From Swiss-Prot:
The record marks 29, 77, 124, 146 as: Important for substrate binding and specificity. This is Ribonuclease T. The active site is at 181 (proton donor/acceptor). Binds two Mg(2+) per subunit. The active form of the enzyme binds two Mg(2+) ions in its active site. The first Mg(2+) forms only one salt bridge with the protein.
Length: 224
């Protein structure tokens, strides 16, 4: 059995990165000026055979930061009333502090050295999380500052679909459009989708990678 056949740990699979699925709901498209209203995070785990599955979930409704823009079109789209006291919203600091604490524990348990965001159209979610972290003065942000795993791009490659709902359906994952644009629901579906893409690549023989030819073998071949 090759050494690569033993690469079934999460840290081995993603070069030391610890993938965490994130989705946000916001009051606009500008991460610097528009409010972050909801965020969900799901960590992932890998079993002894190298199969990836969702693990731990955190979900928060978030109070708009002071002076935040609330675009009416965005609120109409996601159906969030930022001023509804029944939301049980917390500050950006409290939400991200709890998520980062969960992520750092997962990194330690998995022997990973950096978290990497998994998201659908990840640039959007990444920009809002980073802006909120800066506003909250959170110094120990475990996420890579710019590298992400974007399931829109991965789904386009693996499934021929880039829209979350269509990619899920193509992958055999149930998707309820009535629950879409909830950060929790979209994170759950994105986590299932990412795991399916990673596991499908394994089922097709793409992982572990074939062992590279050793230097000694290369030298002996060149002498023949």
């Amino acid at each position: 059995m090759s050494d690569n056949a033993q690469l079934t740990g999460l840290c081995d699979r993603f070069r030391g990165f610890y993938p965490v699925v994130i989705d946000v709901e916001t009051a606009g498209f500008n991460a610097k000026t528009d409010a972050l209203l909801e965020i969900a995070a799901i960590t992932l785990k890998m079993d002894e055979q190298g199969w990836l599955t969702p693990d731990t979930t955190l979900h928060f409704h978030v109070d708009p930061f002071e002076g935040a823009n609330l675009q009416p079109e965005a609120l109409a789209f996601n159906g969030i009333d930022p001023h509804n006291p029944l939301r049980g919203a917390v500050s950006e600091y409290d939400a991200l502090h709890a998520i980062y604490k969960m992520v750092r524990k997962g990194m330690k348990d998995s022997n990973c050295n950096r978290a990497i965001m998994v998201a659908h159209n990840a640039t959007f979610d990444h920009s809002f999380m980073m802006a909120a972290s800066e506003r909250a003065s959170l110094k120990r942000n475990p996420f890579h500052p710019f590298v992400t795993f974007d399931t829109a791009a991965l789904s386009g490659l693996a499934l021929g679909q880039t829209v979350l709902s269509k990619a899920c359906i193509t992958a055999g994952i149930d998707f309820d459009g009535n629950q879409a644009h909830s950060a929790l629901y979209d994170t759950e579906r994105t986590a299932e989708l990412f795991c399916e893409i990673v596991n499908r690549w394994k089922r097709l023989g793409g992982w572990p990678l074939p062992m590279a030819e050793s230097d000694s073998d290369s030298d002996s071949d060149s002498e023949e």
